[in-house]
Amino acid sequence: MTFDWQPVFLTLKLASLTMICLLVIATPIAWWLSRSQHWSKRLVETLTTLPLILPPTVLGFYLLIMLGPNGPLGTLSEQLGLGPLVFSFSGLLIGSIFYSLPFAVQPLHNAFSAIDKQLIEAASTLRAKPLDRFFSVIIPLARPGFLSAAVLSFAHTVGEFGVVLMIGGNIPGETQVLSIAMYDHVEALEYQQAHWLAGGMLVFAFSVLYALYHFNHRSTRR
């Protein structure tokens, strides 16, 4: 039996890019949520948490409409000469960012909220500029939150199925990630190949969560 590594590499590529994009996007959102008292805060919290409770097919359906040739993002992509978004890796990436957004925002929100305001005020009295305070004081204090956000968003992307199937379909080398490849093997009654993929994903998920809890436990004891 020859093992097809293409879905593995594609999944790792998708998860890595999703994680990086989410850290960039979720950081300002989480910081604003942790400090703002604006009336729209509850609305933003609801929207960023919504993917947690929505069935993946519902989210995938509306993303498919948005990314389709007649949707706003799909039309914009075509006008910019970037090509279609549905059934492409770019579409998968956008869908993964939406789907895994809560797994980045929530840990960062909790980490930012736990920072003692007196430490930030102390940095202000030393005439540190806002960006200097953020990078030299806030980010180091929120490091466990950043680690949790990175690990959870990466691991969640690895296990995606419904959203990626609806947006990307099942194109080998382009959109066929691990979960889709495993589904293919099960449909073809190729249980040995499906077992290798499922077992690998199980070991990966357990290892990631164990390492995360171990790190967070050590951090809280310090």
Regions found by a protein language model. Give the residues of each.
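Interhelical loop and adjacent transmembrane-helix boundary motif
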Residues: 1-6, 167-206, 210
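Non-cytoplasmic
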Residues: 69, 146-184
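Membrane-interfacial helix termini and adjacent extracytoplasmic/periplasmic loops
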Residues: 60-97, 167-171
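Cytoplasmic-entry segments and transmembrane alpha-helices of multi-pass inner-membrane transporters
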Residues: 32-63, 120
